[in-house]
């Protein structure tokens, strides 16, 4: 927890730009079929009202995962604060085999103790599956709640939780001197802040694997430029500003390289920069357009979009040489892929019969599953644990963010109130 707090502390440097118009998750499909679970409001052991609803945060996280359906508070058979107070039969009668209980206690120094227990209602009374406690200051209460959610989620699913992650996205506001903003928020839309404001378009944010930097495209110099911004202090490093197009940045998983697309020689081609030396080398060539790189886990292989066969399709290629291999064959065109951290599957924008949706392709079997059902879907980005995809779609006259689980069952929107939202990028674990 202490290490995680140190990693996240850099974001506080930018909180002076926190905005009141935030995005919030609105679930549209899939919770009813998820596993039921009990999450009891955490007992507040101080005067007045609790400073944060930790139990509510845990319940929302588990619901947002698409894998759990927390029992509505009005239906809770009891409100225990400890495992010893849980009456297993009261919960099992409702089909619930796991209950989260906890307490929030204020300390004299202004900090708070957060404690939780995950209780098995199918075992002997008081059987604890997982438990932990944290001492945090007020500004880290939500983070502590997400930490508890991560631990509960992993214990029950065997999958690492991703509730302490963030998303970056571009917002085009309605006028003003700087109508384009690159923003970052918690995965659930809370704690939103502005990373960069610009009078010109901003595009294609991409996270470094340690979560400390964002690469993105800016047009402030009068032409496109690729930059890397350090979130803790706001410092900006220009990576590429060649004639024509500079775009589609992607950090390698080992953090040593940045792949991107340039059209300085005519067609779009892929290049890779060694971030330590600044040396750039060309990876693809020819007359076809090659863009939208995404890395495989080995940090040596790229998947990318190419029109070498006519329409855009996804190919893969080792950056040290060899021929590109086409890996998408279903649909009229496929593009803008994001490979999972284990390299077993990818998500992409797939077009067929005039429809443009987010699809998942198994990289072992080649099987394809369409995940989304929204309109003109684009720019999919995977959560680091591979369970969820965030993407943008058209709605009305604007663009909004959406979530869909990688099994296609859970769907949600993240509507914003102050502009069009696009180009989402899900952070690594923080």
Swiss-Prot record:
What family is reported?
Belongs to the TolB family.
Q: What assembly does the database describe for this protein?
A: The Tol-Pal system is composed of five core proteins: the inner membrane proteins TolA, TolQ and TolR, the periplasmic protein TolB and the outer membrane protein Pal. They form a network linking the inner and outer membranes and the peptidoglycan layer.
Keyword Cell division appears in the UniProt entry? yes
Enumerate the Pfam families for this protein: PD40, TolB_N
TM ranges are none
| Signal sequence range | 1-21
- Which Cys-Cys disulfides exist here? none
Q: Which GO terms describe its cellular component?
A: periplasmic space
Which is a GO BP term held by this UniProt record?
cell division
The cellular location(s) given in this protein's UniProt record come to: Periplasm
Task: State the protein's purpose.
Answer: Part of the Tol-Pal system, which plays a role in outer membrane invagination during cell division and is important for maintaining outer membrane integrity. TolB occupies a key intermediary position in the Tol-Pal system because it communicates directly with both membrane-embedded components, Pal in the outer membrane and TolA in the inner membrane.
Q: Which UniProt keywords apply?
A: Cell cycle, Cell division, Periplasm, Signal
Entry annotated with the keyword Metal-binding: no
Q: What is this protein called?
A: Tol-Pal system protein TolB
